[in-house]
Amino acid sequence: MPYIGSLKVNQFRNLADVDITPHSQFNFFFGQNGAGKTSILESIYYLSVGRSFRTHLPQRLIQDNTDRFLIFITLYNGTQFIPLGVERDCHGDRCLRINGETASSWSLAAKRLPLCSLSAMSHRFLLDGPRVRRQFLDWLMFHVEPSFFSIWQRLQRSLKQRNAALKAKLPLGEITHWDKMLVEDGERLHQLRQNVVTEFKPLFTQMLQQFLPAYPLIGHYFRGWSEKYSLMEQLQINLKQDLQRGYTQAGPQRADFRLTLRDLPAQDILSQGQQKLVTYALHFAQGLLLKEKTGISPIYLIDDLPAELDANKRDCVIDLVNCLESQVFISGIDPNEIRLPPHSTLFHVKHGKVAAL
């Protein structure tokens, strides 16, 4: 399994100078609110995907009165440790380096450093719009389906061009010119998603049984257009409305994965704590499928695990993560709230300083 052997963070939020050696399995960061616990997890996330899970404004990630931040790790890939790092300055310039070479695309870092991130707002997975759930499915395909990323990139280009033509109200021929490419890649993307969902659902059911055995949720995949029509037929049917609205209404960019209980939306029945456990089950199943398909376990980032969970559920989460045989970074206020296994390292975070205990 991949794991982070060392982590250095400079001038990232309130983390002025962090240099730690994480445990290859369990790492628990504790301290008061605002100490910098979440920022540790956020820095790892940023290095993997090139963005934050807390803000869309990257300038907020740079520590006050400084002009840049640096995140650097050594990553064990199964045979050796490789260096992976990023530097970003206040002008927006950033440099990603992998194994001593400048990387041309952040997808290279994401492939090397697969993460399952569970933030303090994880329960929002069920409440927010379908975009976050599409991203959940697409994360899986990115890591298990070699053809996915090129298909997804082509689809985004075709969709962008078609929407621009619709918004500008160009002649119909210039709008429908993009339909063939959009349909070809859209149908292929849908098939990939459908295949992944079919493999994913039994694993999700297995995980959910551990957390909420009395709540047999059912997952439903919606491809983004009517089951009655092909995508080409749907685009033709919608063309008049698409012109009026200035964008493409149907297609894989409208797909969703919804959970129901007794034919009702899960979020209408479950408490916030239960929704959090459902999201944990989803992401643990995601990691299991990645391991089944590739032999690689993701690294888990679990922010504020104790919140809204009683002691039994917290122990259940820890036991499940332990069975996943992955490296995990967990944050919380009180270390006594978590029953950590022996193979763990505790880190105390205070005023942006991190010390192993």
From Swiss-Prot:
Major localization class: cytoplasm
Superkingdom per UniProt: Bacteria
Single GO cellular component term: cytoplasm
Keywords: ATP-binding, Cytoplasm, DNA damage, DNA repair, DNA replication, DNA-binding, Nucleotide-binding, SOS response
BP-aspect Gene Ontology terms: DNA replication; DNA synthesis involved in DNA repair; double-strand break repair; SOS response
Pfam families attached to this UniProt entry: SMC_N
Gene3D superfamilies given in the database record: P-loop containing nucleotide triphosphate hydrolases, RecF/RecN/SMC, N-terminal domain
Residue numbers binding ATP: G31, Q32, N33, G34, A35, G36, K37, T38
Gene Ontology molecular function terms on file: ATP binding; single-stranded DNA binding
UniProt subcellular location: Cytoplasm
Function description: The RecF protein is involved in DNA metabolism; it is required for DNA replication and normal SOS inducibility. RecF binds preferentially to single-stranded, linear DNA. It also seems to bind ATP.
Annotated family: Belongs to the RecF family.
Record's protein name: DNA replication and repair protein RecF
